[in-house]
């Protein structure tokens, strides 16, 4: 690069000025430049700092040479490349339309025709990339640029989509990539964000998320942080996106095929390139494409702007409104993840993070696209969500041409009639007549009461409620999918124009009703149609009219941070003591209501399992409520264990294997979660540390001492689960039986209080707000004493005494645990390990397991030390004088000798782990992230402490070795392996005894700790017989834990 004239800099045949900055990222800045001779050829010059690139500079140069040969109209052209001393300059094609992210921010959603136009161009570019074996790995709306040859107001037909920034992400350092990709993990494939092996199908997942966002306005799966999204993917083996009901069948099938969690089940590139959705069928009548939005220079958020009326869609007639109901009738089911948006007075630019509700108006009858008569309506649901007074079409006669009214105003307009345009992106509207149309509105209301309304479809309109606040209303009743006469599906339309953000009122989710309707919603959502008799017990007349209104698609992507908002609307168990907190006051008998009908229970969606449908997924820990509503929502505790949800729903889940390697943040108690393949110490038989030679074979006497008659033999498959130990009823995950329950009489079972959830880091008991409580008793009424929190299984101390809960089964729901304030959230830092390479993750997992195993061995050494101190007491001195042959076993020196052996083994393991970490860091396989530094620092501290302990014990044992020479021959029988195995056996014995006597507060953590000790011991042993014995013990413990988990979930 050479400095040019007038402050310009030169890169080859191009020049640019650093004043013309058009964009910047974490590692690069982009300037606008031009050709030095052809001044009308505008370019974008991207400057990348070399410090942000990996060491493989030659590979980057080769890749750039390949990219220079990529000539495609839908790929940003790379004109030139120059490498300087400190920077790399890329001269690329300039796109004047911005990127797709800005386009979606302005448009919110796109029509299927526009999506098809864009997707056809993306597929064309991907076809070329796939043929050359190039994986983008970072497809997102920010990397899809738009180019308009005729300017920014060009029609979507003339927009050229171009893919940019491919081939460079792989050359960024891993920790750097974690910083620059903090905004795009929700577009990354699950196998990429979980640091697993991936192939080109990862780009297909990203394309699916982009198409989904174009359709609904948001990504299909969201979380408050990349780490939460990674945990969500790890917990859910099957993912089903919520697709709007009015989506066409080809697009629906395309999204479901692209958004498959398992890359093996995902469609391949050939299927994608030849998908029916990409082929524009001439027989299908398409809706007009969405025009490009204007980019105002000033932040004009006025709701009365009339400049957007040229982009608005045509209104539906009253007859089409009825047709829309017949076609799209559905209750509000799992799509109703309502989320409070910002104040309606804010500008449209300030509402980009809120959930938007997009109007789907029906067009003229000729524009309706009907599917096959036998086609069933899509299983997704619609909910009519309200906006402020957007005038509804059809309130006037045919011969009158209504004038447009201010879109989405917060009060009725004093002048002008009901507007024909649905200019709000907020949602459906409540028709409130302006003063000049009161008589027409009254006439329509009278027509609604007449029995001839089904012969005059244009006389039907939505009955407005008595409130002028923004309202949302759900469909009155669903249309059964088996009715083929109502199977026509509307082509997806959208309404455009400026408008204020949607602000829901407390009545969101309710429906307006007319006189004569019963205030009690039908449990099956039965629909009253003309000519059909109503259901038994219904107070509606035989020809009760159906609610007429515009169907509005609710943007219902399962936002993991918003689920708690809708939970007050879910049906509560009859015995829930908190069930009346959110339920409206009940009238004595159900009477006809002239206001709003109470919210209908949400119906299960066929796309999610039933147990998840009865209660939505728990909110992700620390997830924010993106907007502050006018009323406060309760805080939710951070117990996010899905097993709590399963236990509440009565679903039995038997994990195939129990976890033996928790994360570093979970060192201490264990909670019975199954060990996934990504959490295992490794399949390498050598394990995280090398085996040592067994000084003696582990005898079967220890097995028999541990399991009694249940000691496993080579041909036996019996376990603790099948033995008399089973007489103890299962309590829970580390269930803490409070003293009040233990003191109960024998005539009835004692109520059991147990906790479910993930504890905080460390060995301290979890805080109160982090505990989810369940209280179970035999029979009777509910009690509110179950809301008291007790320490979880982290501490061995008994739980504090609580008032005995009343008989009955009561569940303290997390949503009601804290009602005093609004949800607050501080954005967490992005963990560096989120997007590290697989090799780095495996090495770090081995170091973590070594640290955890060593800590448990140190606990054994501490116990030996305490026993040695106790052996110096007068009681032990008396025993030594009486039982002379047991002096070696009861003396303090013997305990010191055992401690010394354990500390030596710990020092050996830590030294091996530290040396391995150093070698891996030097080899470049292990990155120096903050977590790695923390683990290595802790390993080093423990190593130094172990060496100091060995030196001190060696000095203490000098007299032991001098005075008791006859015991030197027995010193060889002291091995760290035998001590660890004996301690694990003792833990299993004590846990089994406590479980038999129904003292279960520490059984599950002890089982887990013993299982982890045996797991580490298995990596240390070299004798095959010893390894087989340890494996049998592990199987017995795992079966017992599985039985406990099964009993808890049941």
Curated annotation (Swiss-Prot):
The active site is at residue 138. Residues 436-459 have a biased composition (Polar residues). Acetylation by KAT5/TIP60 stimulates the protein kinase activity. The protein kinase activity is activated by unanchored 'Lys-63'-linked polyubiquitin chains: unanchored 'Lys-63'-linked polyubiquitin chains are catalyzed by TRIM32 in an AMBRA1-dependent manner. ATP binds at residues 22-30, 46. It is found in: Cytoplasm, Cytosol; Preautophagosomal structure. Ubiquitously expressed. Detected in the following adult tissues: skeletal muscle, heart, pancreas, brain, placenta, liver, kidney, and lung. Disulfide bonds: none annotated. This is Serine/threonine-protein kinase ULK1. The gene is ULK1.
